[in-house]
Amino acid sequence: MSGLNMNRRKFIGALGLGTAHLLFSNPLYAADTRFSSLDPLQKVTLGNSGIQTTLLGMGTGVHATNRSSFLTRQDEAKSLELLHHAYEKGIRYFDLADTYGTHQMLAKAMEKMDRKELTITTKIWERGGGIPENERPPADVVVDRFRKELNTDYIDLVQLHCMVDDNWTDSMKAQMDILENLKAKGIIRGHGVSVHSLPAMKAALESSWVDVIHVRINPYGIAMDKPDPQEVVEVIHQLHNSGKGVIGMKLVGDGKLQNDSEKIDNALNFVLGLGSVDMMIIGFEEKEQIDNYIGRTQKALAKLHN
């Protein structure tokens, strides 16, 4: 197995045989022991953005669209209990978006949290669908609404949501300039993008505007920008080396692997072992899942340190 020529079948087979550590001796997959401890909730810095948060974060976009998601559809008390449990366990990163409809819910949960400890990310939807079609105002108007919904003076990170075109840095230039101005004013601490195609990811690599990027990553190519993880990993390494913060999402293939314990562990070992993903977000639906992933992440970190 050498470099980018490694056969994908062998790659997946290595994971299945529990020999994923062999992949990390390859420069493409090698860990740089960047994580300072075995603590799954240790503080990490997102690239050169200056934003610090926990290695493990909570996503709120499970089965989400049109300002609706798992958290907004189930009993509110249960969702608040879930958010509070994440906080009590030490999670300090919460991932939101306009299309998830979770701003007001987190605002309620934050009544029992220390805002200064939190990293709140949310995202602006610019594509068709997702939100009412007439709601595409300038980014400063959108961010003002977000702050009111969240009941907060500032937002840590605001991203353009689900970019897929290779020219998004041109088509979104006006919104990007507004977000840059909001950052200069301290209304947001950073800006960036979540991408859902490899061309969009490569465009982000070339853009100095991107502070932090969400990337879809797992060792199985499920719900990713390419079915071959090697192609995605190469760009992720470049993003990291350029100083951009890298947040890993879809670690369990958009939930498709959530009932396969071995593949969950393989995914955690793989993503943490890359050395180029700053933190990971998981869309939790039960308190037990939070506890479970904290334990699994700790074990994965222990493997890396050994």
Regions found by a protein language model. Name each.
Residues L71-H85, E135-E149, S197-A203, K263-F270:
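Short, acidic/polar
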Residues S2-L118, F270:
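N-terminal binding-site loop/beta-alpha segment at the start of enzyme catalytic domains
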Residues K116-G130, H161:
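A short, structured active-site edge motif that brings together acidic residues
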Residues H63-E76, E126-P137, Q258-N259:
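Active-site mouth loops of central-metabolism enzymes
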Residues L150-D166:
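Active-site groove signature of glycoside hydrolases
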Residues L46, M58, F94, I120, ...:
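Conserved, mostly hydrophobic/aromatic
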Residues N48-G50, A107-R115, R147-N151, L205-S208, ...:
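Acidic (Asp/Glu)-rich catalytic clusters
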Residues R9, P40, M163-N306:
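Beta/alpha (TIM)-barrel catalytic core signal, keyed to glycine-rich beta->alpha loops juxtaposed to Asp/Glu
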